């Protein structure tokens, strides 16, 4: 399993994402922290920041932006993906500062992408829901879905492949076409339980078990 960071480092990243967004919404400036954990400067993993609005016991997507193959280093990728999630996701209006107490932050650290160069009919065996995220590319089209999306939606492997194709604005069966490139990756995911409260590491396989009950 891909787990490059400790829980303490994950907490730092989630709190960083929140504090950067708060500063940006308050002052319109991007604040770079002093003396961050050294590994976050030395590493350069893909990073996505997800922001969700708390709706009772449910969570509604508020924004999600990231860098599949990194940006400068993990620290900078977290900072700029957080700003993107709050204010640059084209699906949503920019966040307002007063929303901060009603949203949770989640930071996903992505492993390097691995191209599946095999018979597409074998993808149903090679792709594992609860472990893998997907990237689909064909020509100018591309789409990415994080591994937690398939778990949250209780998708089968085939449904996951179909939805990733659709995310790329391609036919749902694009994964069966050899012109389509399919990449898998893993993610280490850190998340707030409640707005600005405890940060934990998600166990997607444990969450997936609830889909099967």
UniProtKB/Swiss-Prot annotation:
SUPFAM superfamilies: AMMECR1-like (SSF143447). Pfam families: AMMECR1. It comes from the Archaea. Coiled coil: none annotated. Residues 8-201 form the AMMECR1 domain. This is Protein Pars_0011.
């Amino acid at each position: 399993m891909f787990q490059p960071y400790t829980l303490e480092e994950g907490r730092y990243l989630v709190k960083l994402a929140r504090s950067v967004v708060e500063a940006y919404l308050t002052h319109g400036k991007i604040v770079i922290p002093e003396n961050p954990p050294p590994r976050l400067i030395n590493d350069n993993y893909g990073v996505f920041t997800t922001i969700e609005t708390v709706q009772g016991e449910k969570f509604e997507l508020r924004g999600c932006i990231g860098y599949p193959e990194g940006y400068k280093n993990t620290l900078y990728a977290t900072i700029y993906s957080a700003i993107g999630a709050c204010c640059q996701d084209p699906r949503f209006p920019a966040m307002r500062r007063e929303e901060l107490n009603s949203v949770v932050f989640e930071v996903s650290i992505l492993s390097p992408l691995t191209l599946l160069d095999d018979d597409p009919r074998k993808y149903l065996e090679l792709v594992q829901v609860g472990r893998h995220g997907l990237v689909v590319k064909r020509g100018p089209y591309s789409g990415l879905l994080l591994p937690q999306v398939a778990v949250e939606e209780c998708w089968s492997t085939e449904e996951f492949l179909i939805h990733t194709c659709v995310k790329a604005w391609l036919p749902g069966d694009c994964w069966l076409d050899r012109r389509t490139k399919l990449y898998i990756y893993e993610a280490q995911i850190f998340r707030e339980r409640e707005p600005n409260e405890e940060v934990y590491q998600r166990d997607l396989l444990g969450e997936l078990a609830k889909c099967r009950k």
